[in-house]
Amino acid sequence: MLLRALPILLPLLLTLAACRSEPRSDNGAQPLGGMSEAEFASLHELDRTAPPAALGRMVEIAPGLAPAYLSPAQGREGSEPAPVVLVIHEWWGLNANVRHWADRLAAEGYTALALDLYGGQSAQDPEQALALMRAVDGAASEKIVLAGDRYAREVLRAPRTASIGWCFGGHWSLRCALLLPQLDGAVIYYGKLIDDPAQLARIEARVLGIFANQDKSIPPADVDAFERGLTAAGVDHEIHRYDADHAFANPSGQRYDSAAASAAWAETRRFLAQVLAGNP
């Protein structure tokens, strides 16, 4: 019986092991301007004297859908509307870590809209996270992505848009690129991949893939297949790999690798500047 169940259990066990780093509390620091990796990591250190704070606010993107977290672009008051980055949370949900990521993007001059695919819920331990992730309805989540994109274009008047996500959110950043032909760029941090060129050919956006060589849930062989699929589909892409483990860019997790995270963030900043601001 156990041997027959292994093919079913193994993918779930790998996902649980890869994402198991439990979130830590964070403080209410309010950075101005671009954030270095050290400054970003400091947001996740426990400070019991100050409640968690964020620079943005929750907004309704469509009736009946969970609110999204909106962090307006910093330093653009009175100027033209800023490009918008759709932010997709990890398997923990739309928690403080993701709000800090949105604020970090806002510090770069982009308006960040963090979507909630968990209906307002978030996890405090890996078992809760796995249950929430498994309960996600694909069709309902696609509606949320489409509503977020519509809000970005019609309400925020975004001249350009991109998506970014990590782990669970990395997969959904890829799904954003498949769903939204008008998307300019998609950043995928170690998310579940699709390697079928026929499906990938629907992507019009440029793709940046960030992966970890020690990742057992998204192993290098899967990244190789993804890269081959993108090439065969004619998708403009670049792939970067780091000698780190899954979730290495999350300062609130136990697998955080500051060197790899800093290098990946440098690539992400450059990529977003190219696809959203038109910088070389």
Predicted regions and their residues:
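C-terminal motif of bacterial Sec signal peptides marking the signal peptidase cleavage site
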Residues: 16-18
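Serine-hydrolase catalytic machinery in alpha/beta-hydrolase-like enzymes
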Residues: 22-154, 250-252
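Short alpha-helix in the alpha/beta-hydrolase fold that links the catalytic acid
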Residues: 101, 219-229
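Alpha/beta-hydrolase fold nucleophile elbow
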Residues: 156-166
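Gly/Ala-rich beta-loop-alpha elbow adjacent to hydrolase catalytic centers
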Residues: 165-169, 173
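Short beta-strand/loop motif that positions the catalytic acidic residue
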Residues: 209-211
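Acidic catalytic loop of the alpha/beta-hydrolase fold
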Residues: 214-218
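C-terminal catalytic histidine-bearing segment of alpha/beta-hydrolase fold enzymes
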Residues: 231-280
